[in-house]
């Protein structure tokens, strides 16, 4: 197996090369690359030379978006074969593209889900099984995406802290207990939320959904959590979708749950990732299976909150019996939503830095787990309702959200399909302003560094106001 690559050549082709090398499990490595890729552009023709040891392969194509795609597709097949993997992955050569976002674009163009999936099959060689899942999700999502009123928005509030770091996580979140600037962060976040309230009122916006994510929002102290939640509750109309990512069961208690219920939260995410204590310890979760079950049972017996549960296929040393146990638990308890993630080996994560990749199950085993989950969940009455893919995912697979009928999380659909403006608060969050029919974006990214966030909050809010004025007052 080869792991590192070095590319030199035209930048437009380099972006395509990077996506396809990532899909084949390779990382950029300028020091000790095992794969050397050299590209040249001469008289309207790209030539890409790939050298792996004594093996040399040359790919050519016209200097155009189609030519770059063709070279990328051929490169991906070659690298997968070199790695001893099937040349054609389930998603074919679809790399660097959100499948459902492309599907909806093609539905707009060609008029039906059937026509759209046919074009995707022809263009990317996607398997019939994945096309069927993609089409079903597109059909389910379409009613959520039909409203083109650009005064309807969703909101996101990010709390960029956890109390431990999972081995697969590459996000630059800090440990809350170690952070010295808590009061400055909370003051800046308060200003951010108050400013968002003013924007909503100034432009007469309707908030469809609000998602409080992270990190782990429930890592905040009870009183701080209540105050932030109270401010957020003023932004979302009563009865509209209001989610709190309570991902770590050890960070949630009855006091926080009472705050959620009193302030209009109607959905939470409880994320076990797996239901085996030995794997939980190995991946750094910091909680037990018992913690998960006690929280879920408390929520079911004492609240009306809808529940999402996240699981990951491909964790270190995970086996099919482990996944069967996970799905047994889901089917016994029937949370409203279940999200099945495929492990992505990300540079910057402890999993990558500690060279634990040898502990990750083989690609075909992860694919079997994902397929098993699909069959068990659909047999239990769940339907797939959103999907996305990431670079470096095991088996070049996908993450899929499943829902019981009528219980889908609309925010998940809107954030993935990018057909509604999503305005965000907090460090590391991103706002995107969208308008039909082009759905082109205006964007603002808040700094990931919490110190920079609170030190520059005035300038950040001024910039957000300028973008809002440009978007809603100049049409």
Give names to the regions the model predicted:
Residues 173-372:
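Conserved non-cysteine loop/helix-boundary elements of the Radical SAM core domain that shape
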Residues 348-425:
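A C-terminal junction/extension of Radical SAM enzymes
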Residues 1-101, 105-112, 401, 405-475:
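Radical SAM enzyme core and accessory elements
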Residues 217, 392, 428-431:
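Short, glycine-/Ser/Thr-/acidic-enriched flexible segments
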Residues 152-154, 209, 241, 337, ...:
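Beta-sheet entry/capping signal
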Residues 48-50, 157, 268-270:
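Short beta-strand motif preference
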Residues 150-186:
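Canonical Radical SAM [4Fe-4S] cluster-binding loop centered on the CxxxCxxC motif
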Residues 82-88, 108-155, 203-204:
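N-terminal [4Fe-4S]-dependent radical SAM core
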